Amino acid sequence: MRSLLILVLCFLPLAAPGKVYGRCELAAAMKRMGLDNYRGYSLGNWVCAAKFESNFNTGATNRNTDGSTDYGILQINSRWWCNDGRTPGSKNLCHIPCSALLSSDITASVNCAKKIVSDGNGMNAWVAWRKHCKGTDVNVWIRGCRL
């Protein structure tokens, strides 16, 4: 029994933190946090970006070929925006640990996204937004939601 407990405890750190949001649940949270029309981008843009970046999963991580990693519901990159302790030359422009972006509480992700979108490139900073959302009817992502 004791060895089983030790085995279980060994695997606990491997469990991904975070939450998979529902579409409307995420839209409501993002609206509460001031993303609707932030820097001219409607709420639908943000929900669409989250869908194609992480499939609404706050615990999502993706390693890039340059050695950096994208974190959280909006896949914020460790080269520029957060510190994961393993990306050489990280700028950490949001002044946060990347682990904060994996929380079920999306406050850190939203606050950092506001800095990113204000940096000059707007939402073009997100590849998935450029590929799947830009120039499309993003209102479909909030249609039917009680906001």
UniProtKB/Swiss-Prot annotation:
Residues 1-17 form the signal peptide. The active site is at E53, D70. Its main location: secreted. SUPFAM superfamilies: Lysozyme-like (SSF53955). It is found in: Secreted. Residues 19-147 form the C-type lysozyme domain. GO terms for molecular function: lysozyme activity. Belongs to the glycosyl hydrolase 22 family. Monomer. This is Lysozyme C. It comes from Phasianus colchicus colchicus (Black-necked pheasant).
